[in-house]
């Protein structure tokens, strides 16, 4: 099913028992996080806090708190169907010309989906039913969650930050946390390689005296939200990809104070600018690592306008030690990554980002090994092919007889097929997440690849072990008599 706006998605979730309305008064200061965290850890429903303490606007949490809800938000029946979405992205990333008429006919469904890519610009939109401007702007009227007791201030978490570089036609949508520091001020924490930061840097070089326009949408439709966290090709806008997910064009409307187009169905939109010379010290905040991060200076976003629906919903989340919502998103989007990687490396059988690895810091890859040194090639490919994995610290490569998603299997492969000196590849001075305080220098650290494959000639001088296997006839015989033996499973 496809959803035109967030409300349609919430209606369906409620029908399926996947949304719980909380009518009791709950404080956005710490209490919502505690309730959301307990609920998510048990695979529970999305939560709509209808009576946040001190505020009139309800708060939505845990929207994508299970992989199944992520798949639903992308218009898919289950997480397995996300593989097909990954195949479409692989096609868009590197489209292949048809080899003949039959192949052309086979590609028609993919090209038909591309027709849904351009956005549809509206003159009037629900997200602008209420307009607050200038001195009336007061971010303290929004129920912005204060997630952890060590956090320095309330934090905007699920805002879709919309930017555009001076030389680009496409808009960029990114999700960057934003610290509340004043009634019209937020700190925009974006890392230097992210799309918004790149747009900002290009703007500074081209317009040394003009503020950088920014709009932030909260509570967009699920396809648009998820497009912002999906590994789409750099040449494709998130709005275009959302149109593919939804099956019809993304409806947008021009911001009131700038030329940026925002999701027409968004619940709340913050409009404003970043002064090129204004920064502030951000943090500390509890993050997806399970720790509080270091403080660092980032640009300040000045909000000049707030537009919203008359009965707006504030969409929020928390981040902490997995499981949290980012970890769940990573688990679901894992299925999207696989076909993209397989198009470049057909030997890859499976690719898994364990949620315990903080979404992306450790990857397990299984391959159909074809030659000596093959595992090392795959390691390098994982680190370099998609920008999403430039911060992956550990890549473990196993043969295809190992289940990448079973730690018992992976550990068995490491301990029986790996020699630390021969099979561990260390690379120093590589890009690392700024939040990774384990690295010796902020933003710069090392990576480790572990070759846990069976070794071929040229990789070892010893006779390699033969795995123990069971006799299939005996297995079948015991299966037939098992119940009669009276042994409990």
UniProtKB/Swiss-Prot annotation:
Prenylated FMN binds at residues 175-177, 189-191, 194-195. GO terms for biological process: ubiquinone biosynthetic process. InterPro entries: UbiD, UbiD-like_C, UbiD-like_N, UbiD_bacteria, UbiD_Rift_dom. Its EC number is 4.1.1.98. Catalyzes the decarboxylation of 3-octaprenyl-4-hydroxy benzoate to 2-octaprenylphenol, an intermediate step in ubiquinone biosynthesis. HAMAP family: UbiD (MF_01636). This is 3-octaprenyl-4-hydroxybenzoate carboxy-lyase. It comes from Glaesserella parasuis serovar 5 (strain SH0165) (Haemophilus parasuis).
């Amino acid at each position: 099913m496809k959803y035109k706006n967030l409300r349609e998605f919430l209606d369906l979730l409620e029908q399926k028992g996947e949304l719980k309305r909380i009518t009791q008064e709950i404080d956005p200061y710490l209490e919502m996080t505690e309730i959301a965290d307990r609920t998510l850890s048990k695979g529970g429903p999305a939560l709509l806090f209808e009576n946040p303490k001190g505020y009139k606007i309800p708060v939505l949490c845990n929207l994508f708190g299970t992989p199944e809800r992520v798949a639903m938000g992308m218009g898919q029946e289950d997480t397995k169907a996300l593989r097909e979405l990954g195949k479409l992205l692989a096609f868009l990333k590197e489209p292949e010309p048809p080899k003949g008429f039959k192949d052309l006919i086979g590609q028609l469904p993919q090209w038909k989906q591309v027709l849904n890519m351009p956005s549809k610009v509206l003159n009037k939109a629900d997200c602008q039913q209420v307009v607050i401007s200038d001195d009336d702007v007061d971010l303290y009227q929004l129920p912005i969650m204060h997630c952890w007791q060590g956090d320095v201030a309330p934090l905007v978490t699920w805002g879709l930050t919309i930017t555009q570089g001076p030389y680009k036609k496409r808009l960029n949508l990114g999700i960057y946390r934003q610290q509340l520091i004043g009634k019209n001020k937020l700190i925009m924490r974006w890392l230097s390689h992210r799309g918004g930061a790149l747009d900002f840097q290009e703007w500074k070089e081209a317009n040394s005296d003009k503020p950088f326009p920014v709009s932030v949408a909260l509570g967009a439709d699920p396809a648009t939200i998820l497009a912002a966290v999906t590994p789409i090709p750099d040449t494709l806008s998130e709005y275009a990809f959302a149109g593919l997910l939804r099956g019809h064009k993304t409806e947008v409307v021009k911001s009131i104070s700038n030329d940026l187009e925002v999701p027409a169905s968004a619940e709340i939109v913050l409009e404003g600018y970043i002064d090129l010379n204004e920064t502030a010290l951000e943090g500390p905040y509890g993050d997806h690592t399970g720790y509080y991060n270091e403080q660092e200076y980032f640009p300040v976003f000045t909000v000049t306008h707030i537009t919203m629906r008359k009965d707006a919903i504030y969409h929020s989340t928390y981040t902490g030690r997995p499981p949290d919502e980012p970890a769940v998103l990573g688990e679901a989007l894992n299925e999207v990554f696989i076909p993209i990687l397989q198009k470049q490396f057909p030997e890859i059988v499976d690719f898994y980002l364990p949620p315990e690895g903080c979404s992306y810091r450790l990857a397990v890859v299984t391959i159909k090994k074809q030659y000596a040194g093959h595992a090392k090639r795959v390691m390098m490919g994982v680190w370099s092919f998609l920008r999403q994995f430039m911060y992956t610290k550990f890549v473990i490569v196993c043969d295809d007889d190992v289940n990448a998603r079973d730690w018992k299997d992976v550990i068995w492969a490491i301990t029986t097929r790996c020699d630390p000196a021969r099979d561990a590849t260390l690379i120093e001075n590589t890009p690392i997440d700024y939040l990774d305080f384990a690295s010796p220098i902020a933003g710069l650290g090392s990576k480790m690849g572990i070759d846990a494959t069976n070794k071929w000639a040229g990789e070892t001088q010893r006779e390699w072990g033969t795995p123990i296997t069971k006799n299939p006839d005996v297995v079948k015989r015991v299966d037939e008599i098992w119940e009669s033996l009276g042994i409990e499973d």
